[in-house]
Structure formats: C-alpha cells, structure tokens
Amino acid sequence: PSALRLVLLNKADAPEALKSFAEVLKVRLFEKQFGWPVFIISAVARKALDPLKYKLLEIVQDARKKRPKEKAESVIIKPKAVVHRTKGQFQIKPDPEVQGGFIITGEKPERWILQTDFENDEAVGYLADRLSKLGIEDGLRKAGAHVGANVTIGGISFEWEPMTTAGDDPILTGRGTDVRLEQTSRISAAERKRASQVRRGLIDELDYGEDQEASRERWEG
C-alpha cells in the first residue's frame, strides 16, 4: 500500500492574503483531489500544532494495529546426553616408598575417601562399591597388585582386599556389611595413619609419645 501523506502549510502567521490562498489550496486541491489531510500551521508562532500531533498519533496507532503480529521464536533447549565414563578418571602408580604398594590419584576417588567415615562399616562398604564400579579394582589387578597390597588414596593407606577375585562373581552380603572388614588382620584407621607417618619418617616406629611405653608387641598387636 502507498504511504500516507500529510500536507503541512506553514507560516500561517503571514498576511491575510497568504492565509486565504492556503485555504483555497486546502479545500480545492489537496483534500478534495488527493484526499490528503492538510494542516495549516505556524512553526514560529507554534499555532495549530496540537491537531497535527493528534493526527500523527492516530496514524501511528492505526498502523501498529494493522501490522501483522510477529511470532516469537521458540527457544529449544536440547540437554546434552550425560555419558558416564571411567576412563581417565584415576591413575594408578607404584608407590616408590612401599614395595608392592600403589598410589591412586584422581578427583573422584580422592573426594570419596575424604567423605568416608572409616568408623562406619556401611560407609566403608559403600566406598568399596564405588571404587569397584569406577574400575579401580580392575586397574589394580592390571597393575599387578596382589591381595593385601598397600594402596594409598588421598593420603589414606589401606590393605587392598578386592571385592572379587579375577573371573569370580561378586560376593553378596547384607546391607551395611562388608566381608573385607570382618578379617581380623585388617588394621584400624588410626593404625593406617600411624604406619603412613612412620613410612614417611614423620615419627619413630616405637615412639608412642610422652608417658607411653613403646614396644613392638604393642605396635603389632
């Protein structure tokens, strides 16, 4: 459609002859012949400006109503599939200070170790399950670890007792129990910590502190 036109006849403050001529143009030419709205104004004297403003407002509002509504683009969020991967989540290296021992590093196993209450059998069993599912048991086997090998994760050392023997089915036990904890030869968390300190030369093996009698029998049993 053609653009709407408005005719503005300025200088309405001119002599009467000019205003009469403008009235003639308005009636005979623009409005009757072309159908264009005509406004006789005076920009200097600021006369007859309000009718012009109201007409412009009417035109704008009418144009907005006739404008086709734009459809808002739908934002489609496609969540990425979560892939559970174990490769590269931990590393197993020989312990340079313990013969046959291994050190395991990795964000997940180290965090799990710190979150575990080692005085709670169920918590320890849950930790063992998580480490096994992560692939640590298989990794230790491939690294040549034997049952009872000293394994250190996040500064915590323990004797490795695998949940399964290579090629065997897992041993099923009741909730909150772990057959590996029932072995009497397993040392406590405090003993593991002390052994680690002795191994690193932080304390003497037979030093139990002031007013404590040191003996190898006490340490071993």
Swiss-Prot record:
GTP binds at residues 10-13, 42-44. Keywords: Cytoplasm, GTP-binding, Hydrolase, Nucleotide-binding. Residues 82-162 form the OCT domain. It is an enzyme of class 3 (hydrolase). GO terms for cellular component: cytoplasm. PROSITE patterns: G_OBG, OCT. SUPFAM superfamilies: Obg GTP-binding protein C-terminal domain. Residues 1-61 form the OBG-type G domain. Its EC number is 3.6.5.-. Its main location: cytoplasm. It is found in: Cytoplasm. InterPro entries: G_OBG, GTP-bd_prot_GTP1/OBG_C_sf, OCT_dom, P-loop_NTPase. One of its GO terms (molecular function) is hydrolase activity. Pfam families: DUF1967. Its cofactor is Mg(2+). An essential GTPase which binds GTP, GDP and possibly (p)ppGpp with moderate affinity, with high nucleotide exchange rates and a fairly low GTP hydrolysis rate. Plays a role in control of the cell cycle, stress response, ribosome biogenesis and in those bacteria that undergo differentiation, in morphogenesis control. Monomer. Belongs to the TRAFAC class OBG-HflX-like GTPase superfamily. OBG GTPase family. This is GTPase Obg. It comes from Corynebacterium melassecola.
